């Protein structure tokens, strides 16, 4: 992880092997830009990166005066620098976007520091020739790039320290998630997932309960058990329950995650190409583990329960079948018409378990549907639920954190598509359209009336795992949901 050091000095007087200067909104006039003629000669238009070798300055464009673009550009800068021979880089403090908000400086510093730190991540566990980055340190000169409209310069050091703490916690939490999601299925089993959760629990002094198939049988979590049937003798299921209890808790929050450590589709077998990347089907459960790490280290004033349903969905003589009827923990019967709609079965029982805790808020995270990716693209998560105020709060706070989110509406016509002639509900829609919403409506069937307005469903199927670099995310897992939900919890508690 990149070390960030704060120095109470000017950018010019800060010592480092290389300088990093952001050119915001094509403004080449700033004193930190040392060789304007060189930039003009090469027709650099404030997009991408440009290395001034003579002055040892890396110029990185920030296309617009926007805090999210600053975060992305900071990440791009480190991705570039780690390929070079510099051990240290210096950078000043930038304030992009509006200065009217009281927290504008803090949010800019968070974005800058998080972007710098995330730029170093690369999953290279299985590479025989690892290329370790020479870059080890970023030195931040506590000097503003442009004057602040408020008296924020007086609180610069305080804000920088708070932002650095946030960036360190968030980077660590995101890396926990990314490492777990990226772990291949021959290692990343339900038992392994529980071991990762136990490490997080030990480090943060959390309660943890890891339950096996016998517990699931006792609790009549038959939908969850059905998904695991083909793997039971080799990779049995685990219900992982993490608990963070501060001395003062304003709210009780339950976070529920789908932890499909591998999904071949079961007897409704996926095409071979569609199986590739299915190690990432544990993205929701992994996000919950990362969230418990983040929320505990940030010391939020909420009792937080993290519930992960970890299992494989495989084929074999004992595999559950299309036409099976399962009796869920809630007592509702489920007609199985497609075994590749398995995540919702696991979540149905896990959501029931979560409601037994009587939380004030329930949020589930799942790489649930390909339909969500078709509808919103691979960079955006979907928000569903009944409570408009709660959905709006998650969307607003999540967007401010830098994640992309959009609300999808439930409606009575789509609800009819999961009706069954022979059971209480069918696990797959009778139509090919609206699949992300019908999956959310299926989960809604297992939410008790008293919790309808307390529940949110977040489908992270798009951004949880993308096979290219984008924004501050490296190839593969992104840790989708962690930044957004952390911001959501913080905003929720402000209103408590």
Curated annotation (Swiss-Prot):
Protein residues bound to Mn(2+) 2: 258, 263, 281, 342
Top class in the EC scheme: hydrolase
Biological processes, Gene Ontology terms: proteolysis
Cleaved signal peptide residues: none
Reaction(s) catalysed (UniProt annotation): Release of an N-terminal amino acid, Xaa-|-Yaa-, in which Xaa is preferably Leu, but may be other amino acids including Pro although not Arg or Lys, and Yaa may be Pro. Amino acid amides and methyl esters are also readily hydrolyzed, but rates on arylamides are exceedingly low; Release of an N-terminal amino acid, preferentially leucine, but not glutamic or aspartic acids
Cofactor-binding details, from the entry: Binds 2 manganese ions per subunit.
SUPFAM superfamilies the UniProt entry points to: Macro domain-like, Zn-dependent exopeptidases
Species in which this protein is naturally found: Helicobacter pylori (strain P12)
Pfam entry (one): Peptidase_M17_N
Main location (coarse class): cytoplasm
Similarity field: Belongs to the peptidase M17 family.
Catalytic residue positions: 270, 344
Co-factor(s): Mn(2+)
Function: Presumably involved in the processing and regular turnover of intracellular proteins. Catalyzes the removal of unsubstituted N-terminal amino acids from various peptides.
Protein name: Probable cytosol aminopeptidase
MF annotations from Gene Ontology: manganese ion binding; metalloaminopeptidase activity
Binding site for Mn(2+) 1: 263, 340, 342
Classification via PROSITE patterns: CYTOSOL_AP
An example Gene Ontology CC term for this record: cytoplasm
